[in-house]
Amino acid sequence: SADEQKLRERFEALDKDKSGTLSVDELYEGVHAVHPKVSRNDIVKIIEKVDTNKDGQVSWQEFIEAFKRLADLKL
């Protein structure tokens, strides 16, 4: 879908080291730039909830889930 393509582009833009996963820092920098009220701790909490394989990184599938959770935050 068009929405998924936009999310994929956003994911790839945030993935600064092109590892295929997002670190806390990569996700925080990207989200904080758009939503300054989001704290690093907010990002850590979201990653803890969506990081299904517990590697401390956010994969593409985990990113989709994280994005849904971010959309639910009162920003």
Swiss-Prot record:
UniProt-annotated binding residues for Ca(2+) 1: D15, D17, S19, T21, E26
SUPFAM superfamilies per record: EF-hand
Alphabetical keyword list: Acetylation, Calcium, Copper, Metal-binding, Repeat
Sequence ranges assigned to domain EF-hand in this UniProt record: 2-37, 38-73
Positions of Ca(2+) 2 binding: D51, N53, D55, Q57, E62
Modified residues (N-acetylserine): S1
Pfam annotation, one family: EF-hand_7
InterPro entries: EF-hand-dom_pair, EF_Hand_1_Ca_BS, EF_hand_dom
Tissue: Liver, and to a much lower level intestine.
Calcium found in the keyword field: yes
A GO molecular function held by the record: calcium ion binding
Function: Binds both calcium and copper, but not zinc. May be involved in calcium signal transduction.
Description of how the protein assembles with itself and partners: Monomer and homodimer.
The name this protein goes by in its record: Calhepatin
Organism encoding this protein: Lepidosiren paradoxus
